[in-house]
From Swiss-Prot:
Keyword annotations from UniProtKB, A to Z: Dioxygenase, Iron, Metal-binding, Oxidoreductase
Gene label: DIOX2
Domain of life from the UniProt record: Eukaryota
Biological role: 2-oxoglutarate (OG)- and Fe(II)-dependent dioxygenase (2OGD) involved in scopoletin and umbelliferone biosynthesis. Converts feruloyl CoA into 6'-hydroxyferuloyl CoA, and p-coumaroyl CoA into 2,4-dihydroxycinnamoyl-CoA.
Cofactor binding note of this UniProt entry: Binds 1 Fe(2+) ion per subunit.
GO-annotated molecular function: 2-oxoglutarate-dependent dioxygenase activity; 4-coumaroyl 2'-hydroxylase activity; metal ion binding
Protein name as it appears in the record: Bi-functional coumaroyl CoA and feruloyl CoA ortho-hydroxylase Diox2
Amino acid sequence: MAPTKDFSTATNGADSWDDVADFVTKKGHGVKGLSERGIKTLPKPFHQPLEERFSEKKILERASIPLIDMSEWDSPEVVKSICDAAENWGFFQIVNHGVPLETLERVKEATHRFFGLPAEEKNKYSKENSPINNVRFGSSFVPHVEKALEWKDFLSMFYVSXEETNTYWPPICXDQMLEYMRSSEVLIKRLMEVLVVKGLKVKQIDEIREPMLVGSRRVNLNYYPKCPNRELTLGVGRHSDISTFTILLQDQIEVLHVRKLDDTGNTWVHVTPIAGSLIINIGDALQIMSNGRYKSIEHMVVANGTQDRISVPLFVNPKPQAILCPFPEVLANGEKPLYKPVFCSDYSRHFYTKPHDGKKTVDFALINY
């Protein structure tokens, strides 16, 4: 067997795509493995195009996403705050959300445990080795179509059943992720009650509409190791989520940025983590179902030069067989539909066949009048 390339000697950033792909992807070391080798210069395949790189000059000073206390979640004041945030920001941070703080801590600990496994253990869940498509370990986003790789490792797990979870999810983190998903169910129902029933005046979320809104779950464990030349790359490029909405758990490392809505320039809002909080962001599916009233917003993760970071997004998605289209109640006053009906599975497939590219995915469903 040929020896593994010593990336610690890389000084000119010119390492070939094949060398990096072999080490990061095929051997399962991930970008964590690169970082741990003490590289001083970022390998060339991670260099983002100039127009995609992030600059501190793009940050809008003294601005922040809304912070909402969910303890009185069904009060008129809180309902209005949530709906206003979904319309005007697409992102908001919540406290007193009902998910036990000890559950969140166990999730973060389990995430660190998984990424602390040897490369050969993590690589058992790679695209080539995983016994099931619903569990996937990898790096970047879709490396085979990206012109520049993102500085991130991930484990993605799509929930189907408890039986499949017990059989195929990594034992080192599976119980904690299941606990997190179960503990979030009440919060999910409350958000749907506020955003859909109260906000969009949909009469009820019945057995037909519930799968259309929240029929599936995917949880990702993300790891962003410290990065040399962090200004040259990104942890995650600018994109909007395709979910109904996403519940994001993150640590205290400040790297998440959200595009300012209705801004004609290229300015972003820095998201400051609050201990014990969760971040909610509206996804493309709910933007479509609300006929554009609620907004899925571009966001990105910048690389950090001194600290490792984790995040755990829980994607609350429509069922794959669901049809995405505006609710009839939203169009009842004669409002023209902005989006054509599309299968959720087709929309998702479109998203995963291209690199992150801002808000372009939603154009897949847009009606061109």
